[in-house]
Regions:
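Signal for well-folded cores of large energy- and translation-related assemblies
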Residues: 21-24, 47, 67
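Alpha-helical transmembrane segments of helical membrane proteins, especially in multi-pass transport
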Residues: 29-30
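Alpha-helical elements of the RecA-like P-loop NTPase motor core of helicases
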Residues: 18, 40, 64
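C-terminal structural segments of small proteins and small subunits
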Residues: 51-80
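General secondary-structure edge motif
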Residues: 25-26, 42
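Ribosome large-subunit tunnel/peptidyl-transferase-proximal elements
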Residues: 1-24, 35-37
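Feature captures the catalytic cores and cofactor-binding loops of soluble hydro-lyases/lyases
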Residues: 34-60
Length: 80
């Protein structure tokens, strides 16, 4: 994946969880090097809410895709 994510993006596990639980998420990105318990919880939540999950190599690269200078374990694309 190159460039930046487009659309309305929320960054971080708390925001991702909140958007999925409120059925506002259309797509969730999870970094493959994120804490496995955290990643498993997010993936399971997405399955329960029928939200597609895509994996990104590293937290750093996911952060870059989101336009921030730090890594992030998860990011979510939300309905506008």
């Amino acid at each position: 994946m190159n460039g930046r994510l487009t659309g309305c993006i929320k960054v971080g596990t708390k925001q991702t969880t909140k958007m999925v639980e409120q059925d506002k998420a259309t797509l969730v990105y999870v970094a493959q090097d994120a804490d496995s318990r955290l990643a498993s919880r997010i993936v399971q939540l997405c399955k329960q809410h029928d939200v597609k999950v895509e994996f990104v190599d590293t937290m750093r690269s996911l952060g870059k895709l989101c336009g921030i200078d730090v890594g992030t374990a998860t990011a979510v694309v939300v309905e506008e």
